Regions:
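Compositionally biased, low-complexity segments enriched in small residues
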Residues: 2, 60-63, 113
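N-terminal helix-turn-helix DNA-binding core of bacterial DNA-binding proteins
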Residues: 11, 18, 22-65
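Charged, amphipathic alpha-helical coiled-coil/dimerization segments
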Residues: 49, 71-132
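N-terminal leader segment of winged-helix/HTH proteins
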Residues: 1-31, 124-129, 133-141
Length: 143
């Protein structure tokens, strides 16, 4: 017997992903950020100076998705791309002063999202860990 979509894990994950993106949009819009830009910004705010490859690996984004995104963020004045002094093949990413200021403003977003869910922080942390474990079993990060 076939399962109804509402009884499938894949549908629960898919529909939740859409709901999460929709919930983040009004939190990011006043900052002028899209969700992918927010991920890049917060990743660089945490670990500045990453290579494009390191950033893509951490965010699980392919370079064909990441490169245009980085170009737009550089044009907006939020980050700087430069060749690595030791390996010219590598491009390093650094937040500008404007990018750091924007990242500071974005620090309120995770708590605002958590409040929107109405779930206890401990449940959200458990959910994050379970989802990360599932993701890593299905598609481990590239080395």
């Amino acid at each position: 017997m076939a399962l109804a979509p509402t009884d499938m894990l894949c549908f629960a994950l898919h529909s939740t992903a859409h709901a999460v993106h929709a919930a983040y949009a009004p939190l990011l819009q006043p900052l002028g950020l899209t969700y992918p830009q927010y991920l890049v910004l917060t990743s660089l705010a945490t670990t500045d100076g990453q290579t494009v490859g390191q950033l893509g690996g951490g965010l699980r984004l392919e370079s064909n998705t990441l490169t245009p995104l980085l170009k737009r963020m550089e044009s907006a004045g939020w980050l700087r791309r430069s060749r690595d002094g030791k390996d010219e093949r590598q491009v390093r990413l650094a937040l500008t002063d404007d990018g750091r200021a924007l990242a500071k403003k974005a620090e309120s977003v995770p708590r605002a999202f958590a409040e929107k869910t109405g779930l206890p922080m401990s449940d959200l942390a458990d959910l994050r860990d379970i989802l990360a474990a599932l993701r890593d079993r299905l598609k481990p990060a590239k080395a």
